[in-house]
Amino acid sequence: MADSSNNEKAKPLADSKLTLTILDLIQQSNNLGQLKKGANECTKAVSRSTAEFVVLAADAEPLEILLHIPLLCEDKNIPYVFVSSKSELGRACDVSRPVVACAVTVDDKSQLKSQITNVKDSLDRLWIV
């Protein structure tokens, strides 16, 4: 189980409404082939600047396996957010196992462009608080 020190490191943490919006967008992105699943693929997408935004699981054990990704995101100016459950993230990614990280990737012709922009705006607002 995630302890309180992990919760302090997992910032910004999405609220329940934003989490549902993000998980829904992840499902749609997966159906369109715009999703990278897992910490390694996520790291590659961020390094190559092909990620629109990154979603990380706050209950990953140990959380340190993910903490290099926010640093990369900040270097590349890619928004990121933590959600509370790796199991929910796995279900949204259409994987039978928990997923600790995923990245929605860039596609200029995507039907999801407006939804991705809305989520990115919401993620930017998390940092203002």
UniProtKB/Swiss-Prot annotation:
Keywords: mRNA processing, mRNA splicing, Nucleus, Ribonucleoprotein, RNA-binding, Spliceosome. It is found in: Nucleus, Nucleolus. One of its GO terms (molecular function) is RNA binding. GO terms for biological process: maturation of SSU-rRNA; mRNA splicing, via spliceosome. The keyword Nucleus applies. It comes from the Eukaryota. InterPro entries: eL8/uL1-like, H/ACA_rnp_Nhp2-like, Ribosomal_eL30-like_sf, Ribosomal_eL8-like_CS, Ribosomal_eL8/eL30/eS12/Gad45, Ribosomal_eL8/Nhp2. SUPFAM superfamilies: L30e-like (SSF55315). The keyword Nucleus applies. PANTHER family: RIBOSOMAL PROTEIN L7AE FAMILY MEMBER (PTHR23105). This is NHP2-like protein 1 homolog.
